[in-house]
Amino acid sequence: MKFIVLLGALLALLVAVSADRIAREAPEMESVDEAVLTRQAREAEDPAVVEDAIRKFVRWLVQKYGINIHDLIDHFKH
């Protein structure tokens, strides 16, 4: 259960970082930001998109910090 909560939090973080990045790239285009956030909200409801985002984030964690995902899963199982 804790693992599912962690994955949900990671997904929310990914969406927030993406929206922030887009907002910094085009600050004068608020309607673009709203459209992107709407699209991301719709995609967040699609299980395949969520699963892909989680996989990408986990892959990034492993590459960036050398975190072993199996150790992380074992940590939250106990």
Swiss-Prot record:
Tissue: Expressed by the venom gland.
GO cellular component: extracellular region
Keywords attached to this entry: Secreted, Signal
Signal sequence residues: 1-19
Cellular localization per UniProt: Secreted
Pro-piece positions: 20-42
Protein name, as recorded: Small venom protein 2
